Structures are given as structure tokens and as C-alpha cells.
Design a protein with these regions (language model features):
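Short active-site-proximal "capping" loops at secondary-structure junctions
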Residues: 32-33, 70-72
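Short acidic donor-binding/metal-coordinating loop in glycosyltransferase active sites
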Residues: 16, 68-69
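Canonical Radical SAM [4Fe-4S] cluster-binding loop centered on the CxxxCxxC motif
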Residues: 4-46
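Radical SAM/AdoMet-radical enzyme domain recognition
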Residues: 46-67, 74-178
Length: 178
């Protein structure tokens, strides 16, 4: 580590995009909060994200979590993940990369790439019965199918469940389905 700064965390969460294809009731993105005055600036380019990643590695960061919005809406997501992995391998730091996704754009190609790159996948599943009410999209069965495919290929996966008054009653059933 060139310039490790002891006050920096060893893990960072990078919100790669403002864009999202869900409308979740529990969204924590400040630019979508009710009455928000948080400005939407221009998103970083691939080159800019690569520079940020290299600097974070220089300062001692080891683990990267990627989200958005919905990170899969970025055309360069695989390139960004590949860059994180390449720099980590060069520095003999093969820590997992965590991708937080709503799963809507997930496919077998993504799943295979994430397995190859040692990406830990965290997909949103706010409730099987209440999924559409929480997200604005009827996508629960597809997300569950993605969990099954991930398990089949040995991709580490987590169900990201935001517990609310609308879904607490189905929490354990949702967990068992994932």
C-alpha cells in the first residue's frame, strides 16, 4: 500500500449510477427521496471510475461494494468489475467484490461473469407476496429464478430484504424461498 491512510475504511460502497428500473418504497438513494433537493450531477465515466478505484486501493481499501441506482444499467459494469479484480490481483488482494442489484436485468451471462470474477451477489427480495407493492414491478419469480441459477453455478448470493410493515409477516417465507 503506497499511501495507506489509517482513518479510511477498508471497505467502500460505490454508487455507480443514479438510474434505476424499480421504484422502491424504501429507496435510500437521496436523489429520489421525497422533497429532495439533492442534485443529480453528471455520472462518472468508465475512466473516472477506474481512477477512483486505483486511488482507493492506493489508500488501503480492500473490499468494494457496487450499487446504484441499479448498477446493471451501466453498460461498463463488467469492465469496472474487471478493473477492480485486475488491480486487486496485481496487489495480491483477492477480496470479494459485492454487487447489490434488484435482479431485474440479471441473466446467465452476468451470473457466469460474476462467478468468474469472485463477485458476491446481493439481490433485493423485499417479500414474495409484497414484491410489487414494494418495488413497483412484478418481478419476484424472476429474482427467485436468478437465485436458483446462481446456486447452481456456485455463485455466492445473499437475499437483501428490507423489512417493513408491509412485509414483516412474510419474512421467514421469503427467506426460505431465496
Amino acid at each position: 500500500m503506497k499511501n495507506s491512510i489509517p482513518i479510511l475504511p477498508k471497505s467502500v460502497a460505490l454508487e455507480l449510477t443514479y438510474k434505476c428500473n424499480h421504484h422502491c418504497l424504501f429507496c435510500s438513494c437521496p436523489w429520489y427521496a421525497p422533497n429532495s433537493s439533492y442534485p443529480l450531477g453528471k455520472e462518472l465515466s468508465t475512466t473516472q471510475w477506474k481512477w477512483v478505484i486505483e486511488k482507493l486501493y492506493d489508500y488501503g481499501v480492500k473490499t468494494f461494494s457496487l450499487s446504484g441506482g441499479e448498477a446493471l444499467l451501466r453498460d461498463d459494469l463488467h469492465e469496472i468489475i474487471g478493473h477492480i479484480r485486475m488491480i486487486g490481483n496485481q496487489r495480491k488482494m483477492n477480496y470479494p467484490i459485492i454487487l447489490i442489484s434488484n435482479g431485474r436485468l440479471m441473466n446467465e451471462g452476468h451470473l457466469k461473469y460474476f462467478k468468474e470474477m469472485n463477485v458476491h451477489l446481493s439481490m433485493s427480495l423485499p417479500g414474495y407476496l409484497s414484491f410489487e407493492e414494494h418495488t413497483g414491478v412484478d418481478n419476484a419469480d424472476y429474482v427467485l429464478e436468478c437465485f436458483s441459477k446462481a446456486k447452481e453455478i456456485g455463485l455466492e448470493c445473499t437475499a437483501n430484504i428490507t423489512v417493513t410493515r408491509k412485509n414483516y409477516y412474510e419474512l421467514f417465507e421469503t427467506i426460505s424461498l431465496a
